[in-house]
């Protein structure tokens, strides 16, 4: 599957394939590639204190918020792993 089971957004495997494809296109066409990666500050502390159910909900909410903010056809939102997007 190309989707993350928890958040429903693109998973790391699909992200890696997409980045490879975009990188090759950028080299071929001499165009830039932009990449933003982030994690959730203090997520481990939150997850440990509030529980995994709350942590999962947090990850889902972040995925939804970021997906809602990205609207260009060539953009991709992916969960890289853990709390990294």
Across the structure, where does each feature detected by a protein language model lie?
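Amphipathic HAMP/coiled-coil signal-transducing linker helices
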Residues: 1-10, 24
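Conserved long alpha-helical elements within nucleotide-processing catalytic cores of c-di-GMP signaling
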Residues: 11-34, 41-68, 78-82
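Glycine-rich ATP-lid/hinge loop adjacent to the conserved G-boxes
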Residues: 74-76
């Amino acid at each position: 599957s190309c989707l993350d089971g928890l958040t429903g957004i693109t998973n790391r495997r699909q992200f890696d394939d997409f980045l490879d494809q975009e990188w090759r296109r950028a080299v071929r066409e001499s165009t830039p590639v932009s990449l933003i990666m982030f994690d959730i500050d203090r997520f481990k502390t939150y997850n440990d204190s509030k529980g995994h159910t709350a942590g999962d909900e947090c990850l889902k909410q972040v995925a939804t918020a970021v997906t809602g903010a990205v609207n260009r056809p060539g953009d991709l939102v992916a969960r890289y792993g853990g709390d990294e997007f």
